[in-house]
Amino acid sequence: MAAAEPAVLALPNSGAGGAGAPSGTVPVLFCFSVFARPSSVPHGAGYELLIQKFLSLYGDQIDMHRKFVVQLFAEEWGQYVDLPKGFAVSERCKVRLVPLQIQLTTLGNLTPSSTVFFCCDMQERFRPAIKYFGDIISVGQRLLQGARILGIPVIVTEQYPKGLGSTVQEIDLTGVKLVLPKTKFSMVLPEVEAALAEIPGVRSVVLFGVETHVCIQQTALELVGRGVEVHIVADATSSRSMMDRMFALERLARTGIIVTTSEAVLLQLVADKDHPKFKEIQNLIKASAPESGLLSKV
């Protein structure tokens, strides 16, 4: 990992601190990607010690080939700002480690061990309103079958299920890691963050469901803002309005989010015909995905 300024990257001897800070130390909340972990550092700790602490807390999830910058949450502005030059920790604070730039040489790579599938709000009450809903259900089910074959964790949300119903019956939720109700549009809930924290080395999220311009868009932007690479499956996401869907996908692609297809995702995950699961994935995609009107309006 290259930092924004020189830093000692050796791991500290001690582990993460508990809820209370020891004498002579200051409590600090360390945020990385979708995670946030409380710890403590010595009073007066600077940039290098903060980097060491990030590595001790998140070492197995940080891509050492990428460049990162440390930012401090500024109450005055209500947002994160780059760590001021010569900064020293003197009081309780919140810091985060964010990618400084995207490595184009690795952009878009998917591996089963570093990928999670997000299935967003594929619920019964949306059936009459969402364009080509039957098609995206079919493709979504194919993706979940692929996830089971490859051992990829799946997280499913349902938007206000009391009023909008549960996930449609055609979507088989056997073996999914989590099914969560929500009212927030984004899928990035505290329970989702906790679930991701239990999965080592998460780099990428494959995202699909409804609606493209609301829950899908807000989930994708929040994940990217936390350093997660997002792949949106175009043939498994839709909206009530094709215009909303089209402009959402265009906007998301401009932010570096990858707009892809279900077959591209599944074949990228096996990567080689000699992969032990290739035959099962091949059988899954033998029947082409539905040629719906979605594909002419990406």
UniProtKB/Swiss-Prot annotation:
Gene3D superfamilies: Isochorismatase-like. The modification Phosphotyrosine is found at residue 160. GO terms for cellular component: cytoplasm; peroxisome. Keywords: Phosphoprotein. SUPFAM superfamilies: Isochorismatase-like hydrolases. It comes from the Eukaryota. Transmembrane segments: none annotated. Pfam families: Isochorismatase. The modification N6-succinyllysine is found at residue 279. InterPro entries: Isochorismatase-like_dom, Isochorismatase-like_sf, Isochorismatase_domain. The keyword Glycoprotein does not apply. PANTHER family: HYDROLASE (PTHR14119), ISOCHORISMATASE DOMAIN-CONTAINING PROTEIN 1 (PTHR14119:SF17). Belongs to the isochorismatase family. This is Isochorismatase domain-containing protein 1.
